[in-house]
């Protein structure tokens, strides 16, 4: 499952087939093609591009492992990126880690995870009881209701990342600064 939020619309890229095979490779290629096209269109329009994630450590792992896993076996799939292409992207100034910004700007006595920080911005998830572990259970359940809940959860994670980004850009309104404690 890959997901992106462009500021207006959540774009899910999901396969419900067994993982590790052609269906997963095609899904990854669909996501990468959408991302590449979106970035190129922005550049062509004279815009700057920022692709934001919450914790690039995990995202980099999944991007690289997907490229590594599928590059040789499914080279016939259009849009499937090479390891070199993924490495160039994650090393580019367009790939931005919101969590790194959060760690630099905020202190959190209960942590700085997305759910904690996004709630401080006023964001809430439609799927209140879903977290990373529960999302795996939803995927494995495979029912239409579980799939809908998983896509809702992933979409909310994407929108929550945008909410945290806006919150930080606005100066984290409503939160005390370290100067308040000096």
Please give the residue ranges for each predicted region.
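Conserved DEDDh/DEDDy metal-dependent 3′-5′ exonuclease domain
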Residues: 4, 15-136
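Acidic, Mg2+-coordinating catalytic module of metal-dependent nucleases/exonucleases
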Residues: 106, 117-181
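Intrinsically disordered, low-complexity, compositionally biased regions/tails
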Residues: 7, 83, 175-178
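Active-site cores of enzymes that catalyze phosphoryl transfer or operate on phosphate-rich substrates
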Residues: 1-13
């Amino acid at each position: 499952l890959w997901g992106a939020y462009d500021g207006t619309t959540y774009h899910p890229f999901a396969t419900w087939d067994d993982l590790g095979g052609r269906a997963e490779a095609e899904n990854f290629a669909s996501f990468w093609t959408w991302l590449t096209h979106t970035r190129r269109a922005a550049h062509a329009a004279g815009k700057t591009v920022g692709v934001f994630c919450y914790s690039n450590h995990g995202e980099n792992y999944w991007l690289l492992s997907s490229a590594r896993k599928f590059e040789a076996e499914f080279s016939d799939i259009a849009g499937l990126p090479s390891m070199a292409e993924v490495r160039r992207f994650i090393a580019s100034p367009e790939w931005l880690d919101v969590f790194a910004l959060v760690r630099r700007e905020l202190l959190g006595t209960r942590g700085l995870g997305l759910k904690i920080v996004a709630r401080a911005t006023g964001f809430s998830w439609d799927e209140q009881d879903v977290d990373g572990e529960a999302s795996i259970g939803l995927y494995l359940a495979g029912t239409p209701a579980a799939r809908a809940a998983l896509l809702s959860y992933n979409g909310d994670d994407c929108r929550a990342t945008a909410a945290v980004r806006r919150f930080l850009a606005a100066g984290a309104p409503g939160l005390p600064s370290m100067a308040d404690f000096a």
